[in-house]
């Protein structure tokens, strides 16, 4: 399988395993009437979503828009789509022909695509408060990374599984909704919504005013984290807060990026991701001088 095919049809085994584990071990699901359960507090009908064609940066894409009508802040939303049962052989052949003409895929790999059921997905890790909306979320072929641009291809699929992550009492819960069985299942494990370092380094950088912080490397040399739910304006305000702490030595910057040292040699690195409304950040200690 060549690299193009891998990017095109990569399947998410982790998601499949998570659905299996949560559905089998938790034993907490709803019936088709939507009866409430202990851990599932999300009703999929409260997330109003739509997929259609749209123009993004001058190009036509198939995109997902949705509104959070739940009572909770959402941190992740993903929908996978599966091939409709009534797709004809002619429609499947036309789909494969379109793919073959659009991408550099060998005949051997095309045979593998022809043998697969059509699937697609759309996902975003935007942090969305109740009543807020998200637009222009790209849809992708299969579980890969190639953008979906033909609405006729989307018309060959139907919703399969929705994955929703939401905040409740400073924890992030994960819920799955199966459109086929009309049942919910919940992950037994939760995540801390705001993960902040307890090392001395954490006192050398402002705590972002957001609801979700995901920590990465965290030791005496460096503290790395991602903060979610920031606008570019909020990111620029955060830069100014870092400057007020003295991070103005040998600065490097452009829109969406800032890095500088303070007088003691500590460094901050800040990068803004406009697509996910998030900030990649780190604060690092001075490098030890070699003897």
Predicted regions and their residues:
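Short, solvent-exposed, Trp/other aromatic-anchored flexible loops in extracytoplasmic proteins
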Residues: 102-171
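C-terminal motif of bacterial Sec signal peptides marking the signal peptidase cleavage site
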Residues: 19-23
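Asparagine-centered strand-capping/turn motif at beta-strand->loop junctions
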Residues: 65-73, 86-87
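Short, hydrophobic/aromatic beta-strand segments
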Residues: 72-80, 90-97, 236-239
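A cross-family detector of function-defining hotspots
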Residues: 211-273
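Compositionally biased P/S/T/G-rich terminal and signal peptide-adjacent segments
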Residues: 34-49, 184-223, 284-291
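Bacterial signal peptide processing site
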Residues: 25-28
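Short aromatic-acidic-glycine turn motif
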Residues: 55-57, 83-106
